[in-house]
Amino acid sequence: MKDLLGLLKSQGQSDEFDAIRIGLASPDMIRSWSYGEVKKPETINYRTFKPERDGLFCAKIFGPIKDYECLCGKYKRLKHRGVICEKCGVEVALSKVRRERMGHIELASPVAHIWFLKSLPSRIGLILDMTLRDIERVLYFESFIVIDPGMTTLDKGQLLNDEQYFEALEEFGDEFDARMGAEAVQMLLRDLDMPVEINSMREELNSTNSETRIKKLSKRLKLVEAFYHSGNNPEWMVLDVLPVLPPDLRPLVPLEGGRFATSDLNDLYRRVINRNNRLKRLLELSAPDIIVRNEKRMLQESVDALLDNGRRGRAITGSNKRPLKSLADMIKGKQGRFRQNLLGKRVDYSGRSVITVGPSLRLHQCGLPKKMALELFKPFIFSKLELRGMATTIKAAKKMVERETPEVWDILDEVIREHPVMLNRAPTLHRLGIQAFEPMLIEGKAIQLHPLVCAAYNADFDGDQMAVHVPLTIEAQLEARALMMSTNNILSPANGEPIIVPSQDVVLGLYYMTREKINAKGEGMAFSDIKEVHRAYGAKQVELHAKVKVRISQVDTTLDGDKVPSTFIADTTVGRALLFDIVPDGLPFSVVNQTMKKKAISNLINECYRKVGLKESCIFADQLMYTGFAYATASGSSVGVDDFVIPPEKAAIIAKAEAEVKEIEYQYADGLVTQGEKYNKVIDLWSRTNETVTEAMMKNLAKEMTVNKAGETVEQQSFNSVYMMADSGARGSVAQMRQLGGMRGLMAKPDGSIIETPITANFREGLSVLQYFTSTHGARKGLADTALKTANSGYLTRRLVDVAQDLVITEVDCGSTNGISVAAMIEGGDVVVPLGHRVLGRVVAQDVIDGKGDFVLAAGTLIDEHDVRTIEAAGVDEMIIRSVITCNTRHGVCAKCYGRDLARGHQVNIGEAIGVVAAQSIGEPGTQLTMRTFHIGGAASRASAIDSVQVKSAGTVRFNKMKSIERHTGHLVVASRSSELAIADEAGREKERYKLPYGAVLSVREGDQVTAGQIVANWDPHTHPIVSEMEGRLEFSGMEENVTIRRQSDEMTGLTTIEVMEMRDRPAAGKDIRPMIAVVDAEGNPVLIPGTESPVQYMLPEKALLSLDHGATVKSGEVLARIPQESIGNKDITGGLPRVADLFEARRPKDPAVMAETSGVVSFGKETKGKIRLVITPQNGDEPVETLIPKWRQINIFDGEEVAKGEIIADGPLSPHDILRLQGVEALADYITNEVQEVYRLQGVVINDKHIEVIVNQMLRKVEVGESGDTDLIQGDQVEYTHLLDANEKAEAEGKFPAKFERVLLGITKASLATESFISAASFQETTRVLTEGAVTGKKDHLRGLKENVVVGRLIPAGTGLAYHNERKRKKELALAAKEGSSTVSASDVEEALSAALKD
């Protein structure tokens, strides 16, 4: 009996382990796993269905088929456990040992493992320093390889073909040893002396200068060192013994009709065994060499197919022409072991059904069909029935439940009380896709869902299904109630705004309820309190929309949380007074004394949550919903054809447009405009016409005439149903109303270009056949796009989750004083996102000082709504806040650097899985983004030629990064490329900001006051000027007529201009001449740039135009030459989802902007073919830096100009890698954040910056080692940032030199595959490559991330699981401490161990 208990115990106990190591298995190890050798290819006997002895399913090797019964049936029952039957040799045991016992095959000839051979880079090739092609020639018996040259002229590792081999035999006899096949490779690997190789390679690394050689050596050195340190032996990459998978993992199942379904692996094993046995027999018979060789090659091929079918040559196919599934295929891909079975498991106690609306439910409830509940809660019901004594056994209880006796329903009611269930809707794009509710039993078969949680689930009731899961243990129930209950998820984790917001009917009802109507029944009445209003409305003495006076008693909450009661008489309407009745105490009447549109309702709930807390907000949200539904019903809004009013002016507007189009057609026919101009003009015209028609329609719809009390006719907002729905934000938009009542407008062709002829009809009038046909393009493209978008968006989310999954908050404060500086986001002069909004919920890194030098906020403050008002009042423009990117915590992030937990509204807790939350927040709106690349056509490209800055608001001028030259007229001319002009208000807050191009003329100075609408700067948008910085006389050089320049005179004005010829037009003599202008003083001496020794001179690029001649005098700030800007063609702008993916994958754009590699003075060196050589000489005397730039790039700087590191020299899209290299981590984070936000903002999606920073942080995990100093890192190697910091700390502690490094930016896919954890990487993508690399280097997985822990079946080290992991660590350390100092352990030691464990 004791035995039996031992067995049960061993099942329950989980082996405690801290890391998983992957490595190569030695032949001895494989034999030690094995329970016997598989000698025959047979599987089972087709008559008796018993496994053949020594075959692939042999019971003697793998264990019995039936529990505790040997094969011949001599020993049965438990009492013979562990006996080995003498007749059939089978051990009596559980049949499930057939899932874990392995066998082996002794190979007659060694075989190379295909993963280490073919998985690039080939590990065998790298370690032997041979090419893959050569190794394959040896392995597949095409050439001999010299293993031991002896006393001959041959080299070790030299390849010989048959002829050369026989020649060598004749010449040297048996002095040397050359072989072919895997055994030759095995012998070479065995002869490798790793320590010697490592030393010689390290020496050569230090002595060589060749880049390629260094690269090659460091690769090989890394591999050999990995082998040496991991204890793997290179010769194990060639197999002598092949393990055989346990038979129950490759089953053979009988089908009806006497046929068998079998796993492909059995076929593959059978092939190997057949060939192996045939080879053994051939070797015994000492068959001719050529036959043996052929057999060996076939054996190699069959083992290759077993391990990874299709990696080499054609895949072996089964009877039905389908490639067989090999061992590698079993673990990789979506259907492989990792993603199908380890990361995604099906769970018990779950059901699914269609969902319907539950408008009468409370927020924390859901309606659960009785049938489902009975099934889901069965075990609870059984135990209750037994406990009550209503049923004697479980079997009896089961019968009762099946009969559905009345007492069963009573017990079900009891069981279900306060037992939450979880509802999930696929696709679960973010954590709000699974929430917990308390079930209410209902009749019927559909689950009832509370309408307010639909937004979080993205659910509607057109047939969506949802799954129900039951948390069984008390811990699970507790977590479901405390963390996952729908009432705890009012705010969205993506942006901290409420997500439980009324929509559709509810919005319409609340909107209708709070509208005003002129001259409604009861207008002008006064009421003493809201109760009286209720009575009057109930008695039909007043209408809902009547304007009345009501005495209101409100309780407001101050910023410090004090309640302030007050009473006053308000001008309001009946509906608003009734609505205020459900508003909780603590909110002022002003929040509802307005027409409640969707945005207002959202703000109301947000305000409610911040002021009166979670519980009140939930109750209030419910009340809002009930009220909204009630009044939506009362309003009787519906849509009829007559509600779409076609504006009477429409016909005239369209006729006018058509006349203008005719006019443009005539101009085109006369050759006055080009095809392109005509197209743009027409499209512009129709866009404007569409706008005009829409405006006319809205004007018509939005207002209606009515008679007021005095009998005058006045206009008021219309009560047209369609208008109310669109205006309130309940459903529909102006764009949709335009199509129904205005005109459909322009349509796009499938390739994205716009068709010139618009659809002038609308849906109410009906479309003609031609118009209908035109509009099918768009509809079809919409459908195709949606399908693509969903897949792409899902894949982006998957990559994001994978890269960020192991980021968890692990400590409260890392003590970092660094941070990133944040300013308001400004686009085209408008503040899009104010500073306060961006820093809300973040921690201040350095004290905030306003413009006057006054102290505003202390470092370490978590900024809340109150602080935001303080910041805005103080007029702070920029502040430094803590960020995940600058956090010093080694594994994980600290709470201070992250800031507020957006879904809860307070500082984030330790254990919050911020990485996954960030990934979900960015990925979830992915489906709302567009897929297309935009073509700029018509309106857009013309609007882009801005030629002046006109300020929108009054204020004070400020300059930023400004370099300017003063003109003799007193105006300033901008002389730098990154200048900005900002306008600040009285408090010193920045209101608008504009970029100024080089050569812009300013009419204001720093500190000037401007008025709204004033033009402060202007420039010529079509040319790029070269401005003289000093005054003097011009001196030309290299300007020879018809060699480098042409003179052109204008007949009209008689002025001549000089044009610099293009390279391709110049004669040979002019190819190397560089046209230049120098400025000299009256005596003819060159004028110097102030403070330097270099003369003022300007290189003239090709196509430059000059209007001044040699010897002319110039003043400072005068334009010397103009370079015409080629209008940049209609380049496609990548937008939407592909743009976000490009940013996160850190792809280098085509023709990226060229940035200055260092700060200094620019000069141009000798040109090479097709490229300009740009040299930057630093002022401090460092080495000059050269950059080669293609000639066709427009270069923005001139000879002798000073640039700052990272300044843009040639325009183009920025490359994130360049930003990181030249401007640092902060600039990069800023760039990616802004670019990603721009895409989402276009779609109206709000995401908090910190989520994007979390992903950027994960992309920056690796560094490249520059000089390795005294650490054991290899130069040019990519290592984890934390690993490098550890190594440097160690070196510094010993007083040695630390390593130098550069941060590296990896795209999210690369970063996921480069994580420390091989389990996480293997379950993401490229499983074979990851596992091969891991095995060779003997990688250890410390199970720090979430994914690895899910795979090994543990709680994740996040959330409530973090406590479990910390406790495990603590116990282990205490046990260790007890072991080491078992005699004396002081309390302080334990304390230390504890605190260390917690820190860890």
From Swiss-Prot:
The protein's role, per its UniProt record: DNA-dependent RNA polymerase catalyzes the transcription of DNA into RNA using the four ribonucleoside triphosphates as substrates.
The entry's keywords: DNA-directed RNA polymerase, Magnesium, Metal-binding, Nucleotidyltransferase, Transcription, Transferase, Zinc
Residues given in the record as Zn(2+) 1 binding sites: 70, 72, 85, 88
CDD domains (alphabetical): RNAP_beta'_C, RNAP_beta'_N
EC number: 2.7.7.6
Species of the source: Marinomonas sp. (strain MWYL1)
The protein, known as: DNA-directed RNA polymerase subunit beta'
Required co-factors: Mg(2+); Zn(2+)
Top EC class, one word: transferase
Residues annotated to bind Zn(2+) 2: 814, 887, 894, 897
